[in-house]
Each structure stands twice: as structure tokens, then as C-alpha cells.
Amino acid sequence: MAVQKENDRELIVDEDTLSEVINESKSGSPAAGHAVSDYFGTDEIFSRVIASADEEFGKSKRLLYFSGVAAGLSIGLSFLARAAVAAEVMPDGSPLIANLIYPIGFMLIVLGRYQLFTENTLTPVTLVLTRIASVPMLLSNWGVVLAGNLTGALIIGLVMATSGVLEPEAAEVAASFGEHGLSLPWFSLFIKAIVAGWIVASMVWLVHAAQDTISRIVIVFSLMFLIPTADLFHCIIGSCEAFYAVFR
């Protein structure tokens, strides 16, 4: 509560009301930068990330694992869709057209709240940094989610390689994705994966800063499009591509 004096009288003003008044000028635009209400502050975003991490740690290992499997299957859709579109537009079309469909699996994961290992490099770590959770708990969480993601990637890679779901041209393109990753030196692949992981972690932070679904979709699309365009490798999609190349 804030106390103001007017004509020798004390007026008690509710802080929420005061903030609302400050936040609007006569033109309807914010009167001060720090009073813009449709932006979360850094502390608020961090608190939202912690809340999400706390929810993850509260889940059973079984639920966490199957959520990870769902994420692995969903992210395989990025691999499948990119290969199918690339086969249609190449060699005459630009690979950027196929890269536009790459974020689709990440959209499913973000909107469906599935557990993806690279997302978990940010959210659960916040609980360790704030000493709410221990390092062994973090490693256990990572292990369960990674196992689930790899299971999903293995399933989708095996199904795509053995079921004939892809046309011959698309199957060749899909195989080239996996072979390209397997042909790179391990250190180069490692660095590319780290950069891709950093992009995903940035996406997670910005998704928690967004206030509506449309904003989240735009964030996911804008950042995930960078991964194939910059020839980076996401560890789970890369695993799916490698499984496909091996089983084919």
C-alpha cells in the first residue's frame, strides 16, 4: 500500500492500482519503460523456469521415461518431414525450403510439454543452482529422459527404414542426412551439437518468457530453423538419422 497526502489528508492507494495508473499515459502507451506489464523481468522468467523444473522432478521415473519416448517420436517427425520436402524440391530447389519444416517436431514437443534431453540442460539445472535439487537427482533425470528420447528415436528410425513409408527419392535423401553426420570428425560433430544445444536452451528460456501460444510457435520456428541451415546437429534428431542410416 502507498500513502499519499492531498489537502492535508492521507490517501491510501493500492499498489496494483498505482502500477496500473503509471503504466498508462493519456495516449494509452506505457508511461515508463520499467512499468511495461506485458514483459516478464529476468527474475520472473527464472521463476517460471524453476516452476517447470520442479514439475519435472515431481514426475515419476516411468512417466518421465514415456514422456521422453513421446519426445523422441515427435522429433523424428522433423527428420521425416525434412527428408520428404527435400526430395521434392532438390536438386533444383533450395535446401532452405526443406529446412523450413524442420521445427515441426520441436513445436510438438514444446506445445505438448514432452521431455526432451536438450531442453533438460536448462530447466533442471536451475534447481541445482538454487540448491533445491542435488546433482545425483539431476543426473538421474537426465538419464531417464535421454533413455526415453533415444528409444523414441530408435523406434522412428527403424520404422522409417523398414516400412517403406518414404518414397525412394526421399529415402535416399534421409539416408544422406545420417551418412553426412556419421562422416564428420567426432570433434566437429561434438562442437556442432553443443552449439545446437545452446540454441535449444535459448529457445526454452524465451518460451518461458512468452505469454501466448503464437509467440511460442514463432520462437520455436525462428530458432530451430537455424540448426539445419547452419549445418548443426541436434543430438536426438542426429541419433534418429544415424539409426535410419544403420537400419536401412
Model-found features: residue ranges?
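Alpha-helical transmembrane segments and their helix-helix packing motifs
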Residues: 2-248
